[in-house]
From Swiss-Prot:
It comes from the Eukaryota. Residues 42-65, 99-197, 211-283, 424-463, 521-623, 663-722, 755-815, 848-871, 910-958 are annotated as: Disordered. The gene is zfh1. A zinc finger (C2H2-type) spans 74-97, 289-311, 324-346, 355-377, 383-407, 628-651, 967-989, 995-1017, 1023-1044. It holds the Pfam family zf-C2H2. It is found in: Nucleus. Residues 42-57, 158-168, 253-264, 707-719, 857-866 have a biased composition (Polar residues). Residues 438-447, 527-541, 548-563, 577-586, 609-623, 690-699, 781-796, 921-938 have a biased composition (Basic and acidic residues). The keyword Cell inner membrane does not apply. GO terms for cellular component: nucleus. This is Zinc finger protein 1. Residues 133-157, 222-249, 274-283, 427-437, 564-576 have a biased composition (Low complexity). Keywords: DNA-binding, Homeobox, Metal-binding, Nucleus, Phosphoprotein, Repeat, Zinc, Zinc-finger.
Length: 1054
C-alpha cells in the first residue's frame, strides 16, 4: 500500500483548506497517510525544487527551518526507500513490488544512513532522467498520477478497503497489533493540541510505535512464516520475469530502455508502461539483447549467450535436455560414451576400418563383418532353421534364434533327436535298431524307447495321409500337414503310440505330448548324445567310402580264405553269410570304453544282421541318384561337384586308355590255393605269438583308421623290408604312434595282396579265360573293391588306382564282388584319381621303365615271384636298401618323372583328400603334419635307428636362419622342418582355391575349410559346450569358447 499521496505544487497556499475541507480527520485515515499534511505544507521548502512564489510559506513558518527538510520525501513501506514525489513511488511499487501490495506484514525499519543514501540516489536518478518536470505542470502531473494509481491498483485497493472496513485496522499492521487510537487510550494524559502538520507527524510516529509493539508481540513462528512467504514471493517473481523475457517481442538495441540496467524503475519513464496485475504478460520488460533465431530478448549479454547455446548444434552437456552432438556430422547421441564410439568412425576410419561397403558409406574393421553387411543389400540369407524354416543373413542372428528358444523346437532341444528322427524316416519297418539299449542304461533316469507295433501305421504316414493303408486299421481323418520335425517330436514324446491309436486320439493334438516332450528333453539329453555318436560311427562304417579317403581299415585276425569256394555258386551263396559274420565280429571301438557299453556287444550283431539281410537291395542306387552317374563310364557319385570333376578331368583319360587296352583285360577265375597256404602259415605264427585266453571266444575285429601320412611311412618301410622282425615292428609302431599288432597285420595284408596279384598274373599269362566285354568291365568300375595302396598298378586300367582287376567273376557276378574278399572294408571306386596315388607307389609304378642308378652292392629283390606283373610293361623292382633321397627324386616333378606326363600331373600336397562326397570326409588333421617328425633321414642306411626326440608343434616352423629348419620359403622368410610343410605353405602363396561351395560362390584353399563352411548352409553344429549347451559349427569357435569362455559361461537351465 502507499503510505502517502504526493501533493501538487499548483495548490500552494491552500493546503490547510484542503486538509480541513476534503480529508477526514479520523485516526484510521491519519494512520494510512501519516505525512500528508507535512508534505502538503512543506513540499517546496527545498531551494532547488521551489518556485519563486514559495518564499511566502517559509515566512509563514519561520520556527521550523529543519523540520521540513525530510518532510516532503515519500518513503516506500516495503523497502524503505524515499522518493521526492508520488510518481516515482508509484513506478517503484509497480516495478519492484508487484506482488506485495496485499502484504499485511510489518515493514522492517531502516537506518538513517540507508535512508539518506537511498534518498540521494533516488532523487539524483529521478531528476537526471526527467528534467522536464517543473512546477508549472505539476498539477497536471499530479492529476495524471492519481488517475494512474487508481487504475493500476484498483483490485488491491478494493481488497484493502474491504479488509480495513471489516477489521478496523491498518493493512500494514498485523492482526494482533495495537492501533494508534488504542495506544492513545492507554495514555494517562491526552495528546497535546498540535498544528495540523505536526499532528500528522505525531500520528505517524504513533503508528510506527504500534507496529513495533505488534512486531515484538508476534511469535517467532509467525516471523518464520512471513519469511517463507517472502521467499516464495521472490521465487514467483523471478519465474514471472523469466516468462516475460521469453514471451516479449524482440527489441532493437536503440529502443527506449536503459542499456545494461536490470531494474525496471531505471528505465525511461517517458515510455508507455503497463501497470497490470502480476499475472499479466503484457508488461514491457524486454531487454536490449534480442535473439536472432527466435523472439526472445534478454537484459544482459551473458543471458543471451547462454540462450543461443540452445540453437547451436554443438551445445555443451551443461545445458539441460541437450544431447551429445558430433561436431563433424552433427548427429546427436544420448550420452558421451556413444559419442566417443561414434568419433572412432571419423578419427580412425582410415586406419581401422579398411573394408568399405560399395552400396553405402559404412566401413568395417574386419572383412567378415563386411561380408555379413553386404547380405543386407543383396538379400542373401544363407542360414536357415531346419525346424521352422526361417532364414537369416547374419550368423549371429541365426545363432541367437537357435539358442535363445525363439524357435520352439530348438527351445525344446529337438536337435538332439535329429539322428533318431532321420532313422525313423529312412527305415519305417525296422524299429529294432532304434530301440537298441543296454540293460545298464535303465535305472539311470533315462527313458526307454518303445518300438511301434507292427499293426499300427508308421508315424510319418500322418503326413502322407495314408495311415489307413499302412496301419491296416481305421484311423482318424488326416490333419493338415505339420512340419516333420514337429510331428516326430510329438510322437517321440508320446511313448505308447498304440494307446493313442486305440483311444482314437491323435498324438499331434494330444496335450500329453508337449508335457512328455519336455520331460524327454530334460531326462534323455545325455542318452540322445550317446546314441547320436554311436549312430555316426555306425553310419561311417555302413556308408560307401571313396578311395580318396586317407583311411585304411585293418583287420586284426583275417578269416581263413579256405572257406571261400572258387565257384560262382558258392560265392553267391556265401556272400550274405560272410557279410553277417564280418558285421558280427566288428562292434564299434567305443564298446570297449566302459563295462556298460560292453554289454551292447551281444545285442548289436543281431540287429545289424537283420539290417544286412538284403545287401544287394541296400547297395541299390536311389531313384534320384541316377542323375549323379557318369555318362561315359556309368560311375555313380554322391555329389554333383564330384561328378563334374570326374567328367571333366578323369573320365576322358580313362576312356582313352580303355579303348587302347581293353583287349588286355580278361576275366579269369581265382586260384588262391598257394596264397591261402601262405596266409595260413602267417596266421598260425600270429596265433602262437598271442595265444587266445579262451578257446571258445569268437574272433574280434578291431577297426583301425590309418591316415595318409602313416600309410606313406608304412609303404616306405615295406619297400625297404617286407618281412621285418618283431623288434622292428615295435620301432615302426612307436614312430607312427600305432599299435605293433596293427603294423604287423598291415605288412601281412600287403604280402597277401602281392601273392594274389602273382597268382592272377600267372593265370592271365596262361590265357585261362576268354576276354571280358567292355560293358561288364565298365560295370565293374562302379562296384566295391578292396583298398590297395602299395602294389604296382597299371595306369592303363580303370581300376589300377585302387586294386588290380583280379576279382571279376566270369558270369554276371560283378554286382556282388564282396564274396571274393570279405575280410576287409569295401569302398566305392572313383576312377583314376591322382589323389589316391602315394609317392612310393607312383615311384614303383614307373621304376621299371626308367631304373635309377643303384649302389654296386645293393641287392634288388623282384617282387613278383613268378611271371610278369603286367604284360605291357617290363618287370618292376622294389629297392631293398635304396636311400630315401633316391626315392624322393622319383616324386612328381623329380628327375625320374620328367619323361612321364601323368606323373608330372600328380601334385600330392595339393590334392590330398579331394573327394567332395559326404562319405569321403577327410580324417587327417593339419596338426598331424605340423607335429609329426620327418623320417626321410632315418632310413638312409636302410637300418632302423632308435627314435629321435620329437619336435614340438611350435618348433616345426619359424623364420629363416634357424639351422633346425632347412626348408625356407623363397617368397617369404618362413622356414620349415619338412619338405611337405614347405610345399603346403607354398600353396598359400599360389592363390588357388580349388574347393568350391555349391551353395554359394565361395571357394577355399583347403578342404577342411570347405567342410566347415558347408555347415553354415546346413545349420549343422557338431560341437557343443557341456556347460552351457551352446553349439558351434566351426571347431575354431568351439575351441575359443572352451579355452576362454568356459570358465564364466552360464550353465543351461531348462
Amino acid at each position: 500500500m502507499l503510505s502517502c499521496l504526493a501533493p501538487s505544487s499548483s495548490r500552494f497556499g491552500q493546503e490547510d483548506t484542503i486538509i480541513q475541507q476534503s480529508m477526514p480527520s479520523t485516526s484510521p485515515f491519519a494512520m494510512q497517510f501519516p505525512s500528508l499534511a507535512s508534505t502538503l505544507l512543506h513540499h517546496n521548502q527545498s531551494p532547488k525544487h521551489s518556485n519563486p512564489g514559495s518564499s511566502g510559506i517559509q515566512d509563514a513558518h519561520p520556527n521550523q527551518p529543519g523540520a521540513a527538510a525530510d518532510a516532503f520525501l515519500v518513503k516506500c513501506t516495503q523497502c524503505h526507500k524515499r522518493f521526492p514525489e508520488y510518481q516515482s513511488l508509484s513506478e517503484h511499487i509497480a516495478s519492484e513490488h508487484p506482488h506485495d501490495k496485499l502484504n499485511c506484514g510489518a515493514a522492517q525499519p531502516e537506518s538513517d544512513a540507508e535512508d539518506e543514501q537511498s534518498n540521494m540516489s533516488g532523487s539524483s536518478r529521478r531528476y537526471a532522467k526527467s528534467p522536464l518536470a517543473s512546477n508549472n505542470n505539476s498539477s497536471t502531473a499530479n492529476a495524471n498520477n492519481n488517475s494512474t494509481s487508481s487504475q493500476s491498483m484498483n483490485n488491491n485497493s478494493e481488497l484493502a478497503k474491504n479488509h480495513n472496513s471489516a477489521n478496523k485496522m491498518s493493512p500494514m499492521c498485523s492482526p494482533g497489533s495495537l492501533t494508534p487510537g488504542d495506544l492513545f487510550a492507554q495514555l494517562q494524559h491526552p495528546p497535546p493540541q498540535l498544528p495540523p502538520h505536526l499532528h500528522a507527524q505525531f500520528m505517524a510516529a504513533a503508528a510506527s510505535l504500534a507496529m513495533q509493539s505488534a512486531r515484538t508481540a508476534s511469535s517467532p513462528s509467525q516471523q518464520q512464516q512471513q519469511q517463507l512467504q517472502q521467499q516464495q514471493q521472490l521465487q514467483q517473481q523471478q519465474q514471472h520475469q523469466m516468462a516475460m523475457q521469453q514471451l516479449l517481442p524482440p527489441q532493437l538495441p536503440g529502443s527506449n530502455s536503459s542499456v545494461g540496467s536490470n531494474s525496471a524503475y531505471d528505465l525511461d519513464l517517458s515510455a508507455p508502461r503497463s501497470t497490470s496485475s502480476p499475472g499479466s504478460t503484457t508488461g514491457d520488460l524486454s531487454g536490449a539483447y534480442p535473439c536472432m533465431q527466435c523472439t526472445a530478448s534478454f537484459a544482459s549479454r551473458e543471458q543471451l549467450e547462454q540462450h543461443e547455446q540452445l540453437h547451436s548444434p554443438c551445445g555443451p552437456a551443461a545445458v539441460s535436455n541437450v544431447s551429445q552432438t558430433c561436431r563433424i556430422c552433427h548427429k546427436a547421441f544420448a550420452n558421451v560414451y556413444r559419442l566417443q564410439r561414434h568419433m572412432i568412425s571419423h578419427d580412425e576410419s582410415a586406419l581401422l576400418r579398411k573394408f568399405k561397403c560399395k552400396e553405402c558409406d559404412k566401413a568395417f574393421k574386419f572383412k567378415h563383418h563386411l561380408k555379413e553387411h553386404v547380405r543386407i543389400h543383396s538379400g542373401e540369407k544363407p542360414f536357415g532353421c531346419d525346424n521352422c524354416g526361417k532364414r537369416f543373413s547374419h550368423s549371429g542372428s541365426f545363432s541367437s534364434h537357435m539358442t535363445s528358444k525363439k524357435c520352439i523346437s530348438m527351445g525344446l532341444k529337438l536337435n538332439n533327436n535329429r539322428a533318431l528322427l532321420k532313422r525313423l524316416e529312412k527305415s519305417p519297418g525296422s524299429a529294432s535298431s532304434a530301440s537298441r539299449r543296454s540293460p545298464s542304461d535303465h535305472g539311470k533316469g533315462k527313458l526307454p524307447e518303445q518300438p511301434s507295433l507292427p499293426g499300427l501305421p508308421h508315424p510319418m504316414s500322418y503326413f502322407a495321409s495314408d495311415a489307413q493303408v499302412q496301419g491296416g486299421s481305421a484311423a482318424p481323418a488326416p490333419f493338415p500337414p505339420f512340419h516333420p520335425n514337429y510331428m516326430n517330436a510329438a510322437l517321440l514324446a508320446f511313448p505308447h503310440n498304440f494307446m493313442a491309436a486305440a483311444a482314437g486320439l491323435d498324438p499331434r493334438v494330444h496335450p500329453y505330448s508337449i508335457q512328455r516332450l519336455l520331460q524327454l528333453s530334460a531326462a534323455g539329453q545325455q542318452q540322445r548324445e550317446e546314441e547320436r555318436e554311436e549312430q555316426q560311427k555306425q553310419q561311417q562304417h555302413d556308408e560307401e567310402e571313396t578311395p580318396d579317403e586317407p583311411k585304411l581299415v585293418m583287420d586284426i585276425e583275417e578269416p581263413e580264405t579256405k572257406e571261400m569256394a572258387p565257384t560262382p555258386e558258392a560265392t553267391e551263396a556265401a556272400t550274405p553269410i560272410k557279410r553277417e559274420e564280418s558285421r558280427e565280429a566288428s562292434p564299434d571301438p567305443e564298446s570297449y570304453r566302459s563295462s556298460s557299453q560292453a554289454i551292447k556287444q551281444e545285442q548289436e550283431p543281431l540287429n545289424v544282421a537283420e539290417e544286412r539281410q538284403t545287401p544287394v537291395e541296400e547297395h541299390a542306387p536311389v531313384e534320384h541318384a541316377a542323375d549323379l552317374r557318369c555318362s561315359r563310364c556309368s560311375k555313380q557319385f554322391n555329389h554333383p561337384t564330384e561328378l563334374v570333376q570326374h567328367e571333366k578331368v578323369l573320365c576322358g583319360l580313362i576312356k582313352e586308355e580303355l579303348e587302347q587296352h581293353f583287349q588286355q583285360q580278361q576275366a579269369t577265375s581265382f586260384a588262391l590255393a598257394s596264397a591261402s597256404e601262405e596266409d595260413e602259415e602267417d596266421e598260425e605264427m600270429d596265433v602262437e605269438e598271442e595265444p587266445r585266453q579262451e578257446s571258445g571266444e569268437r574272433k574280434v575285429r578291431v577297426r583301425t583308421a590309418i591316415n595318409e601320412e602313416q600309410q606313406q611311412q608304412l609303404k616306405q618301410h615295406y619297400s625297404l623290408n617286407a618281412r621285418p622282425s618283431r623288434d622292428e615292428f615295435r620301432m615302426i609302431a612307436a614312430r607312427l604312434q600305432l599299435d605293433p599288432r596293427v603294423v604287423q597285420v598291415w605288412f601281412q595284408n600287403n604280402r597277401s595282396r602281392e601273392r594274389k596279384m602273382q597268382s592272377f598274373q600267372n593265370n592271365q599269362a596262361a590265357g585261362a579265360a576268354p576276354p571280358m566285354p567292355i560293358d561288364s568291365q565298365a560295370s565293374l568300375t562302379r562296384e566295391d573293391q578292396p583298398l590297395d595302396l602299395s602294389v604296382k598298378r597299371d595306369p592303363l586300367t580303370p581300376k589300377s588306382e585302387s586294386s588290380p582287376p583280379y576279382i571279376a567273376p566270369p558270369s554276371g557276378e560283378a554286382l556282388n564282388p564282396e564274396a571274393i574278399n570279405l575280410s576287409r572294408k569295401f569302398s566305392t571306386s572313383a576312377s583314376m584319381s591322382p589323389a589316391s596315388i602315394s609317392p612310393s607307389s607312383a615311384a614303383a609304378l614307373y621304376f621299371g621303365a626308367a631304373p635309377p642308378p643303384s649302389p654296386p652292392n645293393s641287392q634288388l629283390d623282384s617282387t613278383p615271384r613268378s611271371g610278369q606283373a603286367f604284360p605291357g610293361l617290363p618287370p618292376y623292382m622294389l629297392p631293398m636298401s635304396l636311400p630315401m633321397e633316391a626315392l624322393f627324386k622319383m616324386r612328381p616333378g623329380g628327375d625320374f618323372a620328367s619323361n612321364h606326363a601323368l606323373m608330372n600331373s600328380i601334385k600330392l600336397p595339393d590334392y590330398r583328400g579331394t573327394s567332395l562326397s559326404p562319405g569321403g570326409s577327410e580324417k587327417r588333421s593339419w596338426r598331424d603334419d605340423d607335429s609329426r617328425i620327418s623320417h626321410e633321414d632315418e632310413f638312409g642306411a636302410g637300418v632302423l635307428m632308435p627314435p629321435k626326440p620329437r619336435r614340438g608343434k611350435a618348433e616345426t616352423h619359424g623364420h629363416a636362419g634357424d639351422p633346425d629348419l632347412p626348408y625356407v620359403c623363397d617368397q617369404c622368410d618362413k622356414a620349415f622342418a619338412k619338405q611337405s610343410s614347405l610345399a603346403r605353405h607354398k600353396y598359400e602363396h599360389s592363390g588357388q582355391r580349388p574347393y568350391q561351395c555349391i551353395e554359394c560362390p565361395k571357394a577355399f584353399k583347403h578342404k577342411h575349410h570347405l567342410t566347415e563352411h558347408k555347415r553354415l548352409h546346413s545349420g549343422e553344429k557338431p560341437f557343443q559346450c557341456s556347460k552351457c549347451l551352446k553349439r558351434f559349427s566351426h571347431s575354431g569357435s568351439y575351441s575359443q569358447h572352451m579355452n576362454h569362455r568356459y570358465s564364466y559361461c552360464k550353465p543351461y537351465r531348462e
